[in-house]
Amino acid sequence: MQVRSIIFVCLLSIAGFFPAFANEQKIIKDLKEGGKLILIRHSEAPGTGDPANFNLNDCKTQRNLSAEGIEQAKRLGDFFIKNNISFEKVYSSEYCRCKDTARYAFKNFETFSGLNSTFADPSKTPAHIKRTKEFIEKLDKSKNYIFVAHHTTIEGLASTFANSGEMVIVDRSYKVIGTFKVN
């Protein structure tokens, strides 16, 4: 009886692996085609929101990446290198946790304030999303672009929630092609 239980658990583990593997392979294939927008929520940063007195120019006043968040960002960059996935440019929110995610994952990036969080003032979300879409519209449609942002921005663009360190891949009409989180 114990042997059967062990075999059953092993089979369940294997069965759980294949859908995740198939999703990863589909994501890689889609990204290699180009023309995708890769929306990445910043890596793990403990807490919610930012203190009332935070300053964009002072990381000590903001939520920052945890040690796991730093490792998560590095794994994200490794995923692109390992799978030979090209992208034209990385854009990041001006918040330190996003800039650090972009830096640890991809080294080079530019900040774009349209990607900044609107968590503290949701009334700003529509204006941020409009500005970001106008910015994206000017980019080469045949290339992949990476945007490291916050859940408010990703939800506003793709109408889907992203966990910390998760990628939401969309086409140029903001239709979600897939989501993926590097382990």
Residue ranges and their predicted role:
Residues 152:
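Short beta-strand-plus-loop segments that form exposed binding edges in beta-rich domains
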Residues 41, 147-149:
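Short beta-strand segments
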Residues 37, 145-146:
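Hydrophobic beta-strand anchors of alpha/beta hydrolase catalytic cores
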Residues 135-137:
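...with weaker cross-activation on analogous glycine-rich loops/strands in unrelated enzymes
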Residues 17-22:
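Sec/Tat signal peptide C-region and signal peptidase I cleavage site
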Residues 23-122, 130, 140, 155, ...:
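Active-site-proximal alpha-helix that buttresses catalytic centers in soluble enzyme cores
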Residues 1-6:
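Positively charged n-region of N-terminal signal peptides that target proteins for export
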Residues 9-16:
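Bacterial N-terminal signal peptides
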